[in-house]
Amino acid sequence: MLPEPYRLHHRADFSRTVRRGQRIGRRDLVVHAFVHTYDELAHATERHGDPVAAGSFVRVGGPRFGLIVSKAVGSAVVRHRVARRLRHMCATLVDEVPADADVVIRALPGAATADSAELARQVRSGLRKLGVTPGGGRSPAPRAHSGARPRTDARS
């Protein structure tokens, strides 16, 4: 079970993570991740009418996870089974994901027939590729080629 402080609840949090975060698709799910900074959180809080005194904003808890399991996945029973599996996987990832990250996992129709081990592998792979968990990360943009050939000295 995923404890309450580690869950995304508000529509704005889901929207921010999906729209402003990075996304990577896997066979049975799509992983969205958004890592916050202090300034972004303080600005968002001020916009909603909650003034924040300088230095008073502290995010309590750790990473937050949200799930999107639509009717395309299957019947209510199937959707809830997929959500329970994903929630359990998120609970095991709490210590690996940075505390200032929000992660949204959107289940695709194939998630209904995938087993738990396969879903876990896809979630971990997606987070690793996004650079949220150790051992991966997106490669930086390719550098522009200077046009110069590498020097090969045949002379000795």
Curated annotation (Swiss-Prot):
EC category name: hydrolase
Keywords, in A-Z order: Endonuclease, Hydrolase, Nuclease, RNA-binding, tRNA processing
Keyword Metal-binding on entry: no
Pfam families registered for this protein in UniProt: Ribonuclease_P (PF00825)
Superkingdom of the organism of origin: Bacteria
tRNA processing among keywords: yes
Catalytic function, reaction form: Endonucleolytic cleavage of RNA, removing 5'-extranucleotides from tRNA precursor
InterPro entries given in the database record: Ribosomal_Su5_D2-typ_SF, Ribsml_uS5_D2-typ_fold_subgr, RNase_P, RNase_P_CS
Its EC number(s): 3.1.26.5
An MF annotation (GO) of this entry: 3'-tRNA processing endoribonuclease activity
GO CC field: ribonuclease P complex
Region of interest called Disordered, as start-end residue ranges on this chain: 126-156
Leader sequence residues: none
GO biological process: tRNA 5'-leader removal
NCBIfam families: rnpA (TIGR00188)
Complex and partners: Consists of a catalytic RNA component (M1 or rnpB) and a protein subunit.
Family according to the record: Belongs to the RnpA family.
Primary role: RNaseP catalyzes the removal of the 5'-leader sequence from pre-tRNA to produce the mature 5'-terminus. It can also cleave other RNA substrates such as 4.5S RNA. The protein component plays an auxiliary but essential role in vivo by binding to the 5'-leader sequence and broadening the substrate specificity of the ribozyme.
Name of the protein in its database record: Ribonuclease P protein component
Organism of derivation: Nocardia farcinica (strain IFM 10152)
Organismal lineage: Bacteria, Bacillati, Actinomycetota, Actinomycetes, Mycobacteriales
